[in-house]
């Protein structure tokens, strides 16, 4: 079994993380499934409201007690949704900002 410092930091068994894809591509059940098998599940929160972030976090916690992350795209972040994520206190909050020069053309 591969064990890295990231495993200890995130409280996971394997150094495998689910990408927090927004737009509804990651759902609470998928996040919980990855976390349950020892990886680090992440929920894409881009475009979500504060109440949606809170509800999704509750749905994940209803399925699993394992650690997970909430993921935000900074260029379209909703401050209330981000505040709701902070209040949920997930093990991780992931932030991203895309660069146009890295797009596949």
Describe each PLM feature range.
Residues 1-105:
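Active-site entrance/lid segments in N-terminal catalytic domains of soluble metabolic enzymes
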């Amino acid at each position: 079994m591969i064990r890295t410092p990231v495993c200890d930091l995130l409280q996971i068994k394997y150094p495998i993380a689910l990408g927090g894809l927004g737009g509804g591509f990651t759902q609470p059940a998928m996040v919980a499934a990855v976390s349950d098998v020892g990886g680090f599940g992440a929920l894409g929160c881009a475009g979500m409201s504060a109440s949606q972030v809170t509800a999704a976090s509750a749905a994940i916690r209803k399925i699993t007690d394992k650690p997970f992350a909430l993921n935000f795209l900074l260029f379209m972040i909703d401050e209330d949704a981000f505040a709701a994520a902070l209040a949920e206190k997930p093990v991780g909050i992931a932030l991203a900002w895309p660069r146009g020069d890295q797009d596949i053309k």
